[in-house]
């Protein structure tokens, strides 16, 4: 009887707490203004001036997924938030993922095999956040089937039970129930699968996203709700007065000017560089980041099953690799190699050859995949977290880590893309407590859609096609990229009459101008790699687009020849991070690799690849 009363009391208490929170959140949401359809951010110059002259509740350093999430969470709680990033928003690890929104089947396998409750909690939490991301980023996420090949009948029960457990943990958040297909069905779905000893396959459901654009749109949504943000602004030192952090000294990487940004609290969301900023707070701080590089290659769509992904359950280095359809291509990755601190790493020959070998091992295409078919290769660094108070590395997991450092720096790191919103919520909760901030309400980011998400449906492309007068395939891509905000392209198209940026991928010149005005793109590489994604898909095509993108910037901002030359050089250096250096020459005659003067290449309307470095 006593136990029953205790259970009843706890149930009523939890129900009342839940109801109170929902009512509180609902009242706060009513206070938050819906963004107007014609909203666009202030100019970069205006943002920089505000960073110089105002005092903020929070200064967030690092504009990847977690930092962007912190800016949005803080702004929607009524806090005054500043956000800076040394490069472009999300241009580091956050744009170089496998594009999955997932619980993590490998973490579930570890949870079962090692009886590890922390891994189980990680999966359960991530599956909940997957559902939330589908709600708040509707046009940048989608569900996808993933095939897991089985080459031994003994393993069929293992994969069947494991993926059914994944379904069960998903519960009402499930995107679909996993199922078994026999050998014939597996071959029908993926004609080029390695058929030797193939017994069949399991198919399960998970999520996929456009990570780079999602990151950018989270930042834009934060700015729309009052945050002040600037990309290409690097943190150089912390401002410490009386043993307390009062701001960040930064450098504007565009103009070279110094900026002091003052704030009650500073959040370190710099990912794999978190230890660098922690040592600015405390020179003796023990490292918490173990860096692991992950490389992906982009190859033709034929190397993945029809309308589904493919999971290589055991690579030659005892990991798993995904073959995921994405924007008419296939992404394959990733590697897992311990690495050093680096803001934007370049892919290596070893990574490229390893991934080509993995594709060759799991496909039966003849001839086998060659370097000529690789259109891009890029590397990101996972910020794996270890406990600074534990000397061994056994504590390294994918959970996130939030703590206050010696002089008050708040560090949030670890985790993964799928749980960025929860990481940000935990960081802002701690910031409010640690810095005695006064928010106007609780966290509401579970219910705040990114710009372009309100009113979006699967048929939004039809409205875009009607309004812009573009072919169906272009309208569908615009809907998937911009959501309902694609309709804002109308005024740009009327002005420019639908000029083509890339015939190969149906990108429009108008999109470049739109991204400059509406998405804070300030450099050529911002457009090519983090807004239009051409660099991520096809690095040589991105190289060919440099002049056209440069032309739009020159016309809008009046760039002189010196600035244009610097931007061109910066863009080429950035494209090297997407494989331009190690892929150049593939499938081309060596004579075509000679440099041309700008006048000659513009006269020809085509750029020749620069010579390969020795």
Swiss-Prot record:
Subcellular localization: Cytoplasm
Basic and acidic residues composition-biased segments: 598-614
Predominant place of localization: cytoplasm
Stated name of the protein: Probable glycerol-3-phosphate dehydrogenase
Superkingdom of source: Eukaryota
Record keywords, A-Z: Cytoplasm, FAD, Flavoprotein, Oxidoreductase
Residues given in the record as FAD binding sites: 57-85
Reaction(s) catalysed by this chain's protein: a quinone + sn-glycerol 3-phosphate = dihydroxyacetone phosphate + a quinol
GO molecular function, one term: glycerol-3-phosphate dehydrogenase (quinone) activity
Organism of origin: Encephalitozoon cuniculi (strain GB-M1) (Microsporidian parasite)
Cystine connections: none
Pfam families from the UniProt entry: DAO (PF01266), DAO_C (PF16901)
Pathway: Polyol metabolism; glycerol degradation via glycerol kinase pathway; glycerone phosphate from sn-glycerol 3-phosphate (anaerobic route): step 1/1
Cofactor: FAD
EC number: 1.1.5.3
GO biological process: glycerol catabolic process; glycerol-3-phosphate metabolic process; NADH metabolic process
Similarity remark: Belongs to the FAD-dependent glycerol-3-phosphate dehydrogenase family.
Entry's Gene Ontology cellular component terms: mitochondrion
Chain positions covered by the region annotation Disordered: 595-614
Entries under InterPro entries matching the protein: DAO_C (IPR031656), DAO_C_sf (IPR038299), FAD-dep_OxRdtase (IPR006076), FAD/NAD-bd_sf (IPR036188), G3P_DH_FAD-dep (IPR000447)
């Amino acid at each position: 009887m006593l136990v029953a009363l205790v259970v009843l009391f706890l149930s009523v208490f939890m129900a009342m707490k839940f109801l109170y929170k929902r009512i509180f959140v609902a009242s706060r949401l009513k206070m938050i203004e819906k963004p107007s359809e014609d909203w666009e951010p202030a100019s970069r110059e205006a943002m920089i001036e505000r960073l110089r002259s105002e005092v903020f509740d929070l200064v967030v350093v690092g504009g990847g997924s977690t930092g962007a999430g912190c800016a949005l969470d803080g702004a929607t709680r009524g806090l005054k938030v500043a956000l800076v990033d040394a490069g472009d928003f999300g241009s580091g690890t956050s744009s170089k993922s496998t594009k999955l929104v997932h619980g993590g089947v490998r973490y579930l396998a570890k949870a079962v095999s090692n009886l590890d409750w922390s891994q189980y909690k990680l999966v359960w939490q991530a599956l909940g956040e997957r559902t939330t991301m589908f709600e708040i980023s509707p046009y940048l996420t989608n569900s996808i089937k993933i095939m897991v090949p089985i080459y031994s009948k003994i393993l069929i029960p293992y994969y069947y039970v494991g993926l059914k457990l994944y379904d069960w943990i998903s519960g009402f958040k499930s995107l679909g129930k996993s199922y078994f297909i026999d050998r014939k069905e597996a071959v029908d779905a993926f004609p080029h699968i390695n058929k030797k000893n193939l017994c069949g396959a399991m198919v399960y459901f998970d999520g996929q996203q456009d990570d780079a654009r999602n990151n950018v749109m989270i930042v834009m949504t934060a700015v729309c709700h009052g945050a002040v943000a600037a990309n290409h602004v690097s943190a150089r030192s912390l401002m410490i007065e009386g043993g307390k952090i009062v701001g960040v000294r930064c450098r504007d990487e565009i103009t070279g000017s110094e900026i002091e940004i003052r704030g009650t609290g500073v959040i370190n969301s710099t990912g794999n560089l978190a230890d660098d900023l922690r040592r600015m707070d405390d020179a003796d701080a023990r490292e918490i980041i173990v860096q692991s590089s992950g490389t992906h290659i982009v190859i033709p769509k034929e190397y993945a099953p029809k309308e589904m992904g493919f999971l290589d359950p055991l690579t030659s280095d005892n990991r798993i690799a995904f073959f995921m359809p994405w924007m008419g291509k296939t992404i394959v990755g990733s590697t897992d190699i311990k690495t050093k601190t680096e803001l934007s790493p370049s892919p290596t020959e070893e990574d490229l050859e390893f991934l080509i070998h993995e594709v060759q091992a799991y496909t039966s295409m003849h001839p086998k995949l060659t370097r000529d078919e690789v259109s891009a290769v890029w590397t990101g660094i996972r910020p794996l977290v270890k406990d600074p108070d534990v000397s061994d590395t056994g504590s390294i997991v994918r959970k996130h880590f939030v703590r206050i450092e010696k002089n008050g720096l708040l560090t949030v790191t670890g985790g993964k893309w799928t749980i960025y919103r929860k990481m940000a919520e935990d960081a802002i909760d701690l910031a409010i407590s640690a810095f005695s901030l006064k928010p106007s309400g609780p966290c509401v980011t579970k219910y705040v859609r990114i710009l372009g998400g309100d009113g979006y449906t699967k048929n939004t492309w039809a409205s875009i096609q009607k309004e812009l007068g573009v072919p169906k395939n272009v309208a569908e891509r615009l809907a998937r990229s911009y959501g309902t905000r694609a309709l804002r392209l109308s005024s740009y198209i009327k002005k420019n009459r639908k000029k083509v940026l890339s015939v190969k991928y149906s990108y429009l010149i108008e999109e470049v101008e739109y991204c400059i005005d509406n998405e804070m793109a300030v450099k050529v590489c911002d457009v090519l790699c983090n807004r239009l994604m051409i660099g991520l898909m096809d690095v040589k095509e991105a190289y060919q687009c440099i002049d056209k993108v440069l032309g739009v910037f020159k016309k809008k901002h009046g760039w002189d020849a010196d600035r244009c030359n610097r931007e061109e050089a910066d863009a080429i250096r950035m494209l090297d991070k997407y494989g331009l250096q190690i892929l150049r020459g593939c499938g081309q005659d060596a004579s075509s690799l000679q440099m041309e003067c700008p006048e000659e290449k513009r006269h020809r309307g085509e750029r020749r690849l620069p010579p390969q470095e020795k």
